[in-house]
């Protein structure tokens, strides 16, 4: 009997962990960055590309769906928009990256932080990378790292 109760608690805990917390839902506009040019340099981007990326506008949008275990995500930029529909935490899917190539993408949740992992599926210069989303005061902070160089982008929630 104790084993059944323990199993039930594990299953309930796993099911509740599969839901994106409400704090992530909304539209977030890029406010400022820290160490982002250094991060892009570490990734091997040249001066011109770094300036294009640095001066582009970025918005992150997390939207609820009719299924509480799924969400929609949009990364809106002045160069290109990407939209992922019916995302399930922990389940990989194929989608287009900002570099216009196919990626295997997985969103996961750990200790209240959301992780977006991209694995490029086509040739080219794109490298595997992970973005970490967490809250820092009133900002949605997105952290990314390459070869020990961390870039941080701070997004402000729009009304």
From Swiss-Prot:
One of its GO terms (cellular component) is extracellular region. CDD domains: FABP (cd00742). The keyword tRNA-binding does not apply. Residues 1-17 form the signal peptide. It comes from the Eukaryota. InterPro entries: Calycin, Fatty_acid-bd, Lbp1-4. It is found in: Secreted. GO terms for molecular function: lipid binding. First detected in hypodermal precursor cells at the time of gastrulation. From the two-fold stage through to three-fold stages, expression is localized exclusively to hyp-7 but disappears in newly hatched L1s and subsequent developmental stages. Expression from L1 to adult stages is found in a single neuron in the ventral cord with a process into the nerve ring. Keywords: Lipid-binding, Secreted, Signal, Transport. Belongs to the calycin superfamily. Fatty-acid binding protein (FABP) family. Forms a beta-barrel structure that accommodates hydrophobic ligands in its interior. May play a role in sequestering potentially toxic fatty acids and their peroxidation products, or it may be involved in the maintenance of the impermeable lipid layer of the eggshell. This is Fatty acid-binding protein homolog 1. It comes from Caenorhabditis elegans. The lineage of its organism: Eukaryota, Metazoa, Ecdysozoa, Nematoda, Chromadorea. The gene is lbp-1.
